[in-house]
Amino acid sequence: MTVSCRGARAVNYSERGRCTVRKSTLISVSILLSAAVLTAGVAISAQDKYTVKVTNGLAFSEFRGYERWPVIAISENGGQIAVILGNPAMIDAYNEGVPGNGRPFPDGAKMAKIHWNPKKQETYPGQPTVPGTQHDVDFMVKDSKRFADSGGWGWGAFEYDPVSDTFSPATEAANPPQGHDAKCGFACHTIVKNRDYVFTEYGKR
């Protein structure tokens, strides 16, 4: 005898009084559950980077939304392609002439530098070199009180693993070395102390 049970579209009532869900229904439920798990996995992966933090240093979450910041400039260094981005406070300061006018960047100014391994598009006209797999993302933030012992800036470097799609703090073996603080870029950037420790110029556009 065929009856309708709540939660199952069509079932067969067996002599033992059990409701056996049709095979097609089981398959549909299985597919839906698999899709839900995959969706949850993607969501978790997308959120993971915002939980990453350098011990006694910068947290990835301090730069939430950096992917949509305006471009300051692009560069190639050490065989990697990079794009340098700035938050509104950083861009406004550049537009006002900082640091060329001798004034420092304001507290709250932030920069992000995304590095990719280069990839040559051999089938495209001119065989252009374009970004391939991501390598890392580096951050700078101006906070003259918080980072008084490093020129008013805090630095953080986070390496990317394309296999697991996750970020982790760079290590002492990285370039620049990332210790348990926010000074990984300070030694290098002292070369441009007269530019408020910022190498990148705002490209004309």
Regions found by a protein language model. Give the residues of each.
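Short, Lys/Arg-enriched N-terminal segments with co-localized hydrophobic residues
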Residues: M1-T20
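Positively charged n-region of N-terminal signal peptides that target proteins for export
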Residues: V21-T25
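Sequence context surrounding c-type heme c attachment/ligation sites in exported
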Residues: A46-G78, G102-R205
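N-terminal post-signal-peptidase region of extra-cytosolic proteins
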Residues: V83-N101, E122-P125
